[in-house]
């Protein structure tokens, strides 16, 4: 009995991977075995960095809030503690935006929690 092969599915599978490898440098973009490994590694990096991205943005927001709070002589931890105590339900993203782009509004919040 002859060996059963499914060339249509094989071609589709390879075509999908090669399409994902488009834009890669050197043999990574046009040699099947190299492209397959490159795409697999890229997917691992993409998965990891979707998590890292969230961490980085949170750290950025904290730095911005800290900078805004220190202009008024208060540390980040003191400020956030007082914000929670006064039941101000603004998250770090919004507070960071206020500190950077709307300093008057941020100062109002600071004065409210002092």
UniProtKB/Swiss-Prot annotation:
Residue ranges of coiled coil: none
GO annotation terms (biological process): ribosomal large subunit assembly; translation
Gene Ontology CC terms: ribonucleoprotein complex; ribosome
GO molecular function, one term: structural constituent of ribosome
Gene3D superfamilies cross-referenced by the UniProt entry: 6.10.160.10, Ribosomal protein L20
Cysteines joined through disulfide linkages: none
Alphabetical UniProt keywords: Ribonucleoprotein, Ribosomal protein, RNA-binding, rRNA-binding
rRNA-binding listed as a keyword: yes
Protein name (Swiss-Prot/TrEMBL): Large ribosomal subunit protein bL20
Organism field: Flavobacterium psychrophilum (strain ATCC 49511 / DSM 21280 / CIP 103535 / JIP02/86)
């Amino acid at each position: 009995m002859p060996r059963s092969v499914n060339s249509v599915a094989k071609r589709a599978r390879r075509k999908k991977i090669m399409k994902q490898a488009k834009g890669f440098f050197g043999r990574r973009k046009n040699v099947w075995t190299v492209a397959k490994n490159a795409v697999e590694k890229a997917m691992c990096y993409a998965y990891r960095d979707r998590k890292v991205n969230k961490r980085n943005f949170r750290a950025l927001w904290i730095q911005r809030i800290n900078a805004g709070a220190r202009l008024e002589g208060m540390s980040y931890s003191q400020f956030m503690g007082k914000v929670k105590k006064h039941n101000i339900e603004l998250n770090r993203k919004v507070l960071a935006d206020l500190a950077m782009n709307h300093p008057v509004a941020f100062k109002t919040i600071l004065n409210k929690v002092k």
